[in-house]
Every structure is written in C-alpha cells, then in structure tokens.
Amino acid sequence: CVVGIFPGTGIGGACVYEGQLIIGKNSSCMEIGHLPMMPQGQLCGCGQRGCLETLASRLAISAAAATAAYRGEAPHLLEAAGTDLSNIRSSALADAIKAGDTAIEQVVRHAARWLGRGVAVAVNLMAPDVVVIGGGLVEAMPGFYLDEVEESARSYCMSPYRKTFKVVKAELGDNAVTIGAAALAREAGKK
C-alpha cells in the first residue's frame, strides 16, 4: 500500500493498493486535507472548521508567514515577497529560512508537524509501506520539511506502526498530475 500526500494550496491525497488507485463510490477519496484537526479552528474552504488544510497547506503557511513579515518578524521574506499571499511561494519561504528568518522556519516547522499528524492518521488507518510526500514545499525544502513531517508522523502514529513505513519525496515533479490523470483515465477505460 502506498499513500501519497500533496500539500499545496490545499492538501490532496491518494492511495494505491495492490497496483490499483482507491477511489470512492461517487468521487475521489483520501481527502486528507479535510481531516478535522481542530474543531474550533479556522474556517476551511469546504465549510468545516479546523481541517488539516487550515493548518498545514502552503496557503496556511503563506498566511502565517505574511503575518510574520507584516509584524517585522521576517525581514528577508518581507523584502523578497512582501505580504501578498500570491507572492509567498514555497521557494520564497525556503529562501527566507536560508537568509535567517527564524519566524518563517517556525511557521513551516509548525505546519510540517501538523501534516505529520495527518500522515499518522493515514498510517493508522491504511498501514502503508510507503508514504510519498510531494509538492512545492517538499521540492523547495526537501530535507528540513520532509524530516519534520516524518518525525511528527512517527511520534503520532500507533507504536506498532512507527517502524513499518518509509516517508519519501515524490519524484515526478510537475508531471505528477498529468501522469496521475492519465493513469486514472486508463483505469476508468478498463471498467
């Protein structure tokens, strides 16, 4: 079993079991970004409160980073990207961390740890052999970000599972969506 989790504007997910993509009856499944993590948390785009996306998506990270920049806590990010969320991309976050914006490092670390909790839920439910994490955050900060996600996942999943899975970086980059869509279309054509 392989679980894929892709934090970006939202947080998408997928699961492949015995070579088959698991899909729901009426639509996709593995909407991991909408796991309820904080019942009294921020309003999510889905209409619920406290979903994982409100805590760990790149959009949530960018919003917290913009606040830090506005408050003067992230001068490098402020100079490079300002406080406009559309300018605060994964690469700008990585550059700000490299330049010494510790507030941005804390924001990203906090979000990565929340994503790790989501990974732990997936591990507890699916017992995957591999968890693939992809997207711009992983590409911009592969070691730091992935290490935080993995450490958090292992600390929050059930102890029997802690050493049973690998966390790896997605390798398809910008081609992942195209390849995934083609595979899904091929599978749909077989039915």
Question: Which residue ranges define each predicted feature?
Answer:
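Residues that mark the start of a beta-strand
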Residues: 1-2, 166
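Short glycine-aspartate micro-motif
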Residues: 2-6, 12-14, 43-45
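Short glycine-rich anion-binding loops that position phosphate/pyrophosphate groups of nucleotides
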Residues: 8-10, 137-138
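Short phosphate-engaging motifs
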Residues: 11-12, 177
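A cytosolic small-molecule/anion-sensing beta-strand core signal
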Residues: 17-18
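ATP-binding/phosphotransfer module of carbohydrate and carboxylate kinases, centering on a glycine-rich
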Residues: 21, 36-191
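Structural signature of FAD isoalloxazine-binding scaffolds in flavoprotein oxidoreductases
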Residues: 28-31
